Amino acid sequence: MKWSEFSIHTTQEAVEPVCNILHEAGASGVVIEDPKDLVKEWGVHYGEIYQLNPDDYPEEGVMIKAYFPVNSFLGETIEEIKEAINGLLLYDIDLGHNKIQLVEVLEEEWATAWKKYYKPVKVSNTITIVPTWEEYEAHEDEMIIELDPGMAFGTGTHPTTVLCIQALENVIQGGESVIDVGTGSGVLSIAAAKLGASEVLGLDLDEVAVKSAQMNVKLNKVHRQVMVRQNHLLEGITGTRDVIVANILAEVIIRFVADAKAVLKPGGTFIVSGIIKRKKNDVKDALVTNGFQIEETVELEDWVAIIAKNGHE
């Protein structure tokens, strides 16, 4: 079988929205080549547990590669992808070079190409993310999240995911109810359950993401605590929860802050990331305007996570 490798040279800011577009278009895998991973300083506790090859990375910017089966619909799919990516400019997202290339690859080349980009990575004091095919022996007090990266993978875990997991690790004490808005692969829902949350609801508008998350939830044996379903943000969600975590675009976070306040218990915690540094204050302003108290702001590379409390106790 032949595959088409769709590659786009863009910016780190555009990585998550572009990857989402590629997933929704039916990509069988997404590779993220970010040269910042070569010089990433995780400190003593966190980091990639393998050696990266500098030859695999662009000199600047980020290269995103997605793989699609060659069929009669490919041309139409590519045009829809281009249109959706250009539409990100309406959200003030810097696309950088925005240079797109298409190359045909054979099945065996594709099978080898993507696995080299996904290795175990320690993302917090207690959690390490491991691809399903890797043999990895957990150390004492180390929790493993196994992921099948069939839908998305890169050279390491995205900074916003790392920030959210570290925030969950600090917030969850045991027995909390959690909502994960825009769950994607389900990694944050799984992390919340493994850290001790008793009830987790993962929400995503994308049907493919929901299926991927459900599979990863079963893989990690947290299906008793975690339910994943298709939903647009917090629309129609009833009841209140202890924690809401959302790793999505700043503009989207701003749009549903009021809904998050309504769904959070008094004194509940709202963890948000997916925020590029230059949009940090916009999100903070929206949170404060809606009655949240900013507890902490954490930065990693060009990204920000904000931990806020529902102020009306």
UniProtKB/Swiss-Prot annotation:
CDD domains per UniProt: AdoMet_MTases (cd02440)
GO cellular-component term (any): cytoplasm
Family annotation (InterPro entries): Ribosomal_L11_MeTrfase_PrmA, Ribosomal_PrmA_MeTrfase, SAM-dependent_MTases_sf
Lineage top rank: taxon: Bacteria
Places the protein is found: Cytoplasm
One biological process term in Gene Ontology: methylation
Positions of S-adenosyl-L-methionine binding: 161, 182, 204, 247
Keywords: Cytoplasm, Methyltransferase, S-adenosyl-L-methionine, Transferase
UniProt catalytic activity: L-lysyl-[protein] + 3 S-adenosyl-L-methionine = N(6),N(6),N(6)-trimethyl-L-lysyl-[protein] + 3 S-adenosyl-L-homocysteine + 3 H(+)
Keyword Metal-binding: no
Any one Gene Ontology molecular-function term assigned to this protein's record: protein-lysine N-methyltransferase activity
EC numbers: 2.1.1.-
PANTHER family: ELECTRON TRANSFER FLAVOPROTEIN BETA SUBUNIT LYSINE METHYLTRANSFERASE
General function of this protein: Methylates ribosomal protein L11.
Similarity section: Belongs to the methyltransferase superfamily. PrmA family.
Designated name of the protein: Ribosomal protein L11 methyltransferase
Organism: Halalkalibacterium halodurans (strain ATCC BAA-125 / DSM 18197 / FERM 7344 / JCM 9153 / C-125) (Bacillus halodurans)
